[in-house]
Amino acid sequence: MAANKKILKALKSTITHLENSIHALNRKDENSLAESIWHVAAELEYTLFLFSVTFQDEIDKSKWKLNPKLKKLEVGSTLVTAQDLLNEAEKYMSNKKLLDAYKNAYIARHYILKVQKDFAKKKREALKKK
């Protein structure tokens, strides 16, 4: 049971950082946004690590469908999608549906990594222009 509490605590921390990211986006504060996204990714990785320790090799994540059409999504809509997935994961945790929570967190990670990748690309392009 202690593992479930740790997972839920990490998941809540991830959601809090994601909310901070959305607020930074609304304020058009790119530095805070990038920093908050980094914290989201770090907390989400920790959450997924805790899930993986709980489940070990019991599941086949390759069956979890990720959205392949993430080429040109806006940052805001991508963050909202990740937020919805993480809020749903939190509800699953409350209902003791750990596998469903794990799946949603795993898919949310895909969206967060997409945002990070886009930020890195913009930063590289800005450096090339200088």
Language model feature labels by segment:
Residues M1-K130:
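Long, charged/polar, soluble alpha-helical segments
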